[in-house]
Design a protein with these regions (language model features):
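DEDD superfamily 3′-5′ metal-dependent exonuclease/proofreading module
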Residues: 1-62, 67-74, 84-403
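Short beta-strand scaffold segments in enzyme catalytic cores
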Residues: 79-81
Length: 403
């Protein structure tokens, strides 16, 4: 088993002005062989941009390379990881220069996972993790992924694929969208033949003391896996979209127009978009801009809506007036013009200007706001715009709290 170790320096320009890797850095150095484990160690230094938003000490990024999709009928020939240790980010690759090195790779991998909380990957839930689980079962090994949280950035990219106008959800596609430069020219499938060719000639070249051809093949195999992992550190910025849509933004101001309310916000983090985005919904328009500003335009409706009382058993429905009145008052109405109210008929009507109700925190202010609907079973409810304006305090409208 060959081990490649690198220390990663934090330099943002890495992905936008990346230097070519010196070929000599991946050729095995006989002076760095660990005799006890027969492991060859190659040292190098590279750079990357750190974009993860969770505690870096708890993170492991990983990716695997195999000779096929089936764990039973293929070989696990490379595992790469990046993790924070000793005040710097470390990058390690375990490469199987013999086909029976799989157990060594898995042992080394799970040694790194000890005491880590997050395992970050790209489509690892769909392939990498199930594949390793099968290998663990195949070799009757005592390892599990149950004690570490899996974060699959593929699922995040898939969620925003349409919004970002991506052709597909492949890693190279989101890398290109985020302007991440990739030197590797091959995909995992193409490198299967490269690995098979490496295995054929490596032992012969090692006996001859001439590793020229196998070293070139090894470089291609390692580079693909390296860029899959290191570029993934930059792809983590896509998670900021989750923060955005969870409401993690700063309110600036609002403006009430004739037919809409415009609420303006900004984020204190760089949004992972390369063009302005506009999302249109039934009741609002969301504009997400490259300058990290966000504008939400909420429609204003001028119509007659209904407020439904919850304690309908204490109300009569007045047939002519088409409203519900409390029994203490309605008892004086002729019986032929009143009936016991039902949940769907226990309402009052009011013509006013309304805004749609979105998710909000039910604090002492919003609890006392009346929710109006068009019909009883409607999921969409509304608030009176006049009430919201009256409740505005210190330039921070309750409307902001509602969205």
């Amino acid at each position: 088993m060959k081990i490649v170790k690198k220390t990663l320096d934090i330099r943002p320009e890495y992905f936008f002005n990346k230097n070519n890797i010196d070929e000599n850095n991946i050729i095995e150095d006989e002076n760095n062989v660990n005799d006890e484990n027969n492991m060859e160690v190659v040292e190098n230094t590279s750079n990357y941009i750190k974009e993860a938003s969770i505690d870096e000490k708890d993170i492991v990024f990983f990716d695997i390379e195999t000779t096929g999709l089936s764990a039973i009928n293929s070989v696990l020939y490379l595992i790469g990881v990046a993790f924070y240790d000793d005040n710097s980010w470390q990058f390690i690759q375990w490469f199987a220069d013999e086909c029976d090195d799989e157990v060594k790779l898995i042992d080394a991998f799970f040694e790194v996972l000890k005491n880590k909380k997050y395992l970050i990957h790209y489509n690892g839930n769909g392939f990498d993790i199930p594949y390793i689980k099968k290998k663990i079962e195949q070799y009757d090994m005592n390892y599990t992924f149950e004690n570490i949280e899996s974060i699959d950035l593929y699922n995040t990219v898939k969620k925003y694929k349409k919004m970002l106008a991506l052709d597909n959800c492949r890693l190279v596609t989101i890398e290109k969208y985020l302007s991440i430069v990739r030197e590797d020219k091959y995909n995992g499938k193409e490198l299967i033949d490269t690995y098979k060719e490496f295995i054929k000639i490596y032992s012969l070249e090692k006996l001859k003391g001439d590793l020229d051809k196998s070293s070139i093949l090894l470089k291609d195999l390692l580079l693909h896996n390296e860029e899959d992992i290191i570029n993934l550190l930059a792809v983590t910025r896509i998670k900021y979209l989750d923060d955005l849509f969870a409401g993690n933004m700063i309110f600036d101001e609002y403006d009430i127009k004739e037919d809409r309310v415009c609420c303006k916000y900004h984020t204190d983090y760089k949004l992972p978009i390369n063009n302005n985005i506009e999302i249109t919904r039934e009741n609002c328009i969301v504009k997400i801009n490259t300058d990290n500003s966000v504008v939400i335009e909420i429609a204003i409706y001028n119509e007659v809506l209904k407020y439904y009382y919850e304690d309908y058993k204490n109300y009569y429905y007045l047939i002519k007036e088409d409203v519900a009145v409390h029994k203490s008052v309605a008892q004086y109405v002729d019986k032929e013009y009143r009936v016991q109210a039902k949940p769907s008929t226990c309402y009052i009507k009011k013509e006013d200007k309304y805004v749609p109700a979105f998710n909000y925190k039910k604090d002492k202010d919003t609890k006392r706001m009346l929710e109006f609907k068009r019909e009883y079973k409607d999921k969409q409810s509304f608030y009176q715009l006049s009430i919201i304006k009256d409740m505005d305090k210190d330039g921070k409208t309750v409307l902001y709290e509602l969205i």
